[in-house]
Amino acid sequence: MIEKIWSGESPLWRLLLPLSWLYGLVSGAIRLCYKLKLKRAWRAPVPVVVVGNLTAGGNGKTPVVVWLVEQLQQRGIRVGVVSRGYGSKAESYPLLLSADTTTAQAGDEPVLIYQRTDAPVAVSPVRSDAVKAILAQHPDVQIIVTDDGLQHYRLARDVEIVVIDGVRRFGNGWWLPAGPMRERAGRLKSVDAVIVNGGVPRSGEIPMHLLPGQAVNLRTGTRCDVAQLEHVVAMAGIGHPPRFFATLKMCGVQPEKCVPLADHQSLNHADVSALVSAGQTLVMTEKDAVKCRAFAEENWWYLPVDAQLSGDEPAKLLTQLTSLASGN
């Protein structure tokens, strides 16, 4: 229902317009206060790169963060990552992730990023506190990448990167809750790079698609072509589950059942195992896998995806960030 409201297919969005105007008024006032320096943003002693969204829902932001961190690491840059840790319930904040940190403590995306990149990752509702925690323990970090936080103006930033869904784009264009917008589309004029996940990119936008890898068994780590798996049940607890189901079909998999879950939904063995009958194989997203690995069964697999950016602009962006991190 919410997708139909945000896309404009359902007329119910009009009923939510008063709340959207209120949201837009408040968010605009907050941004104006920082722009006029009525409120002071905290500036880190190292450059900060924000990777964020203008819309709610899954846009492919986390794969972009992983891509960015890995690309900078390959260039010899020491990177730290901060996140709000949506859905996390740590005993105290900021929380610096370790190999023992759970998704319940830190949230799904921070654990995934930590496991994929081995970069220092910290979570806190106050992102500046997370930055301070990383720099206190890892003073050699040269640049901070913040996963989400475009609207978190309390943290000053040097580079802003926005990721948008090239198919859904901005829906009906309205602020939450009548539409999907956290900020209006005009905000794109002030950011440094716009990355478009799928669809047809417009002038100045960097094309991106998600490239699936081999399926990975949660219990054994065994890898295989996902098309070799039989009697597949697909599970996705991400911002936009249909994208994952479409990816599986693109890989030659025709799931016997597709199970969309809420983004950041907590998972347990009983609930997940109930999705699969005898002889079936469960295939989930990597984001779900970080929550299920501790209690996984032998017929549970996940399909990792990597961000693939096209054109000349990604190299220019990486050159800019490398120079920034190096102090040049």
UniProtKB/Swiss-Prot annotation:
Its EC number is 2.7.1.130. The keyword Cell membrane does not apply. ATP binds at residues 55-62. One of its GO terms (biological process) is lipid A biosynthetic process. It comes from the Bacteria. Transmembrane segments: none annotated. One of its GO terms (cellular component) is plasma membrane. Pathway: Glycolipid biosynthesis; lipid IV(A) biosynthesis; lipid IV(A) from (3R)-3-hydroxytetradecanoyl-[acyl-carrier-protein] and UDP-N-acetyl-alpha-D-glucosamine: step 6/6. The gene is lpxK. InterPro entries: LpxK, P-loop_NTPase. Transfers the gamma-phosphate of ATP to the 4'-position of a tetraacyldisaccharide 1-phosphate intermediate (termed DS-1-P) to form tetraacyldisaccharide 1,4'-bis-phosphate (lipid IVA). This is Tetraacyldisaccharide 4'-kinase. The keyword S-adenosyl-L-methionine does not apply. It is an enzyme of class 2 (transferase). One of its GO terms (molecular function) is tetraacyldisaccharide 4'-kinase activity. Belongs to the LpxK family. Keywords: ATP-binding, Kinase, Lipid A biosynthesis, Lipid biosynthesis, Lipid metabolism, Nucleotide-binding, Transferase. It catalyses: a lipid A disaccharide + ATP = a lipid IVA + ADP + H(+).
